[in-house]
């Protein structure tokens, strides 16, 4: 009897969303729980959105600032129908990982690297912006529970605006207008600066970030293509030996983050961001050709694809 009831529950869950994972599969949010016990449960906090930044200007840079870039900012333009004269700055990380704050001049700072995720990151962030619009200058925006249904960032951000990222050496921009920061802010600033890995955004291609972590160097490239399509293309290049960015580089795997893949190359010690510019542009051309190839994968390419798939890590 219990088994029959369980099957009914599973069938009902899949009937609500035919594209949802099987109830017994891991939830795609990365919690480690089964889908039926996480975002697939009847009392789930919010529908899980696999690609929450899709449709925003600079989708891949949003992902980079949330997941892999320690210190960076970008100015945000809101839609004309959002009733405010305040400007918004997106920050990778704010002091004490705050969701947001309103500066003394009224500027809203929105933090991307936070400790909560209620299923739709875009909705979570929009809730912070909306609360900030009602907050007096000089106050932080505290973390709260599930914001519930409401506007997403796509409803607030001007779709025709840009999203120009500025990468910083550290987090001193937090206190650029403070003569002598002290207390919790100073301690948080010191800890954040100590942990920040040197990072540079390449200029010749989009959303590729060179970084040095300890004595190792990497290039992490957030790409907007569907995961399956990109994996096929990378497999074609790998089988031909065309997935390198020149001598001293090696494609070692990829991250899965917010609905897209982030291929990662390990680099020799002497390879800087500047020396990667030309090889990265050449690789982008090869990748475009591989993405346009719709033929079936060869045996070698299927083997390469399996290897690449086994070297993925979900970080959302």
Describe the function of each predicted region.
Residues 1-82, 91:
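Acidic/negatively charged segments and metal-coordination signatures
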Residues 3-8, 37, 256-258, 264-316:
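C-terminal structured domains
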Residues 59-69, 116-121, 127-130, 234-236, ...:
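Short, Φ-rich (hydrophobic/aromatic) sequence segments
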Residues 78-107, 207, 243-244:
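Amphipathic, interaction-prone secondary-structure segments
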Residues 89-92, 108-112, 219-221, 263-265:
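Generic recognition of long tandem-repeat/solenoid scaffolds
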Residues 104-217:
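Internal, hydrophobic cores of structured domains that mediate oligomerization or house catalytic pockets
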Residues 138-151, 165, 203-205, 244-255, ...:
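Short glycine-rich, low-complexity/disordered patches
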Residues 170-280, 287, 294:
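A contiguous, surface-oriented mixed alpha/beta subdomain in the mid-to-C-terminal portion of proteins
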């Amino acid at each position: 009897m219990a088994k029959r009831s369980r099957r009914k529950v599973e069938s009902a869950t899949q009937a609500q969303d035919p594209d949802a994972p099987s109830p017994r599969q891991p939830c795609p949010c990365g919690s480690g729980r089964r889908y039926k016990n996480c975002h697939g449960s009847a009392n789930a906090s919010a529908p899980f959105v696999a690609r929450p930044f899709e449709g925003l200007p600079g989708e891949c840079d949003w992902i980079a600032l949330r997941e892999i870039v320690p210190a960076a900012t970008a100015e945000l333009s809101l839609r004309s129908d959002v009733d405010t004269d305040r400007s918004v700055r997106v920050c990778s990380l704010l002091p004490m990982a705050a969701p947001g704050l309103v500066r003394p001049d009224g500027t809203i700072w929105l933090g991307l690297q936070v400790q909560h995720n209620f299923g739709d990151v875009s909705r979570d962030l929009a809730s912070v912006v909306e609360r900030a619009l009602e907050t007096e200058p000089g106050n932080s925006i505290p973390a709260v529970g599930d914001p519930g249904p409401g506007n997403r960032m796509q409803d607030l951000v001007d779709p025709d605006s840009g999203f120009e990222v500025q990468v910083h050496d550290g987090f001193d921009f937090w206190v650029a207008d403070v003569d002598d920061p002290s207390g919790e802010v100073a301690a948080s600033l010191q800890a954040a600066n100590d942990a920040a890995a040197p990072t540079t955004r390449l200029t010749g291609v989009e959303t590729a970030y060179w970084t040095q972590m300890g004595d190792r160097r990497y290039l992490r490239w957030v790409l907007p293509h569907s995961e399956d399509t990109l994996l096929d293309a990378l497999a074609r290049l790998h089988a031909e030996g065309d997935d390198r960015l020149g001598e001293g580089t090696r494609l070692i795997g990829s991250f899965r983050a917010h609905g897209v893949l982030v291929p990662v190359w390990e680099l020799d010690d002497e390879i800087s961001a500047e020396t990667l510019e030309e090889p990265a542009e050449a690789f982008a051309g090869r990748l475009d050709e591989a993405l346009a190839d719709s033929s079936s994968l060869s045996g070698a390419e299927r083997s390469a694809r399996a290897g690449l798939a086994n070297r993925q890590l979900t970080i959302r």
